[in-house]
């Protein structure tokens, strides 16, 4: 248990142990996914699912395909996707496309993560060998079962990850039924 107020600053990549992409892996996925190339009207390169999202969201897709080429060609110049989108902030279609790609690839990675159980449940045991299990163990250390609701009263988490792994894991791991508190 943390007896004094404690702040944890969680950097990007902290969910990599759970199958989520690091910042550089996310940049690589976005780069490959947005590098749309067509041959005879058929998509030959790029992410088909992302292209379908574009077609469903925007009435004029061509400016976004062009934006995808520009972002794809420059993204490796920047240390993060955030920096790339900041660079392109005056180009709304590039920023919108970049944000859409981030959401697309993070949601896909969350669905494929070992933590993703059946029917929207969370496979808590999949995190047994990760820092998340160690973290919750530290928070519960020294507490009695009836005090589990106080485990995080002195903890603040500042999370720089796009994914929801930390929140999902902690929420699921601390459910009353898991601790026979109902």
Predicted regions, residues:
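An N-terminal structural lobe/cap that precedes and organizes the functional/catalytic core
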Residues: 1-49
């Amino acid at each position: 248990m943390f007896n004094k107020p404690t702040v944890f600053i969680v950097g990007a990549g902290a969910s990599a142990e759970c199958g989520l992409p690091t910042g550089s892996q996310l940049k690589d996925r976005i780069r490959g996914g947005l590098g749309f190339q067509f041959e005879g009207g058929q998509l030959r390169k790029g992410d088909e699912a992302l292209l379908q999202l574009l077609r469903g969201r925007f009435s004029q897709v061509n400016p976004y395909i062009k934006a995808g080429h520009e972002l794809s060609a420059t993204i490796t110049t920047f240390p993060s996707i955030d920096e790339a989108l900041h660079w392109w902030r005056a180009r709304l279609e590039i920023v919108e496309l970049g944000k859409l790609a981030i959401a697309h690839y993070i949601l896909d990675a969350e669905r494929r993560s070992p933590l993703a159980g059946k029917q929207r449940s969370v496979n808590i045991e999949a995190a047994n060998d990760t820092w998340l299990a160690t973290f919750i163990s530290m928070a519960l250390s020294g507490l009695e079962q009836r005090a589990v609701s106080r485990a995080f009263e002195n903890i603040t988490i500042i999370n720089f990850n796009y994914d929801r792994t930390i929140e999902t894991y902690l929420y699921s791991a601390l459910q009353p039924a898991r601790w026979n508190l109902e």
